[in-house]
Amino acid sequence: MISNEAFVLGCSAIGAGLAMIAGIGPGIGQGIAAGHGAAAVGRNPGARGNIMSTMLLGQAVAETTGLYGFAVAIILLFANPLLGKL
């Protein structure tokens, strides 16, 4: 029979892995945004400053979901609040 602590740790590891899946979306989105930004600068080099600042702001906003997933994974693995409930 598995102990309660082992079960919580196992489920926390699975949850941390699932939380890290949140990093896939921002990575793909940022790659697409960078590609389109480079294409836009190639078409209109005079608007480089506006294009780059807008692209970087959009990438920063998109990255927050990945960072939240990373924070949840770190909390589940190293500062597990569920272990205190046993």
Curated annotation (Swiss-Prot):
Gene3D superfamilies to which the protein is assigned, alphabetical: lithium bound rotor ring of v- atpase (1.20.120.610)
Q: Give the transmembrane region(s).
A: 8-28, 64-84
- Annotated site residues (Reversibly protonated during proton transport) in this chain: E63
Give UniProt keywords alphabetically. ATP synthesis, Cell membrane, CF(0), Hydrogen ion transport, Ion transport, Lipid-binding, Membrane, Transmembrane, Transmembrane helix, Transport
Q: Name one GO molecular function term.
A: lipid binding
Which GO cellular component terms, listed alphabetically, does the Swiss-Prot or TrEMBL entry include?
A: plasma membrane; proton-transporting ATP synthase complex; proton-transporting two-sector ATPase complex, proton-transporting domain
Compartments, record wording:
Cell membrane
How does it sit in the bilayer? Multi-pass membrane protein
What HAMAP family does the entry give? ATP_synth_c_bact
Purpose of the protein:
F(1)F(0) ATP synthase produces ATP from ADP in the presence of a proton or sodium gradient. F-type ATPases consist of two structural domains, F(1) containing the extramembraneous catalytic core and F(0) containing the membrane proton channel, linked together by a central stalk and a peripheral stalk. During catalysis, ATP synthesis in the catalytic domain of F(1) is coupled via a rotary mechanism of the central stalk subunits to proton translocation.
The family line of this record is: Belongs to the ATPase C chain family.
Q: How does it assemble?
A: F-type ATPases have 2 components, F(1) - the catalytic core - and F(0) - the membrane proton channel. F(1) has five subunits: alpha(3), beta(3), gamma(1), delta(1), epsilon(1). F(0) has three main subunits: a(1), b(2) and c(10-14). The alpha and beta chains form an alternating ring which encloses part of the gamma chain. F(1) is attached to F(0) by a central stalk formed by the gamma and epsilon chains, while a peripheral stalk is formed by the delta and b chains.
Query: Which named protein is this?
Result: ATP synthase subunit c
Species of origin: Lachnoclostridium phytofermentans (strain ATCC 700394 / DSM 18823 / ISDg)
Which gene name does the record give?
Answer: atpE
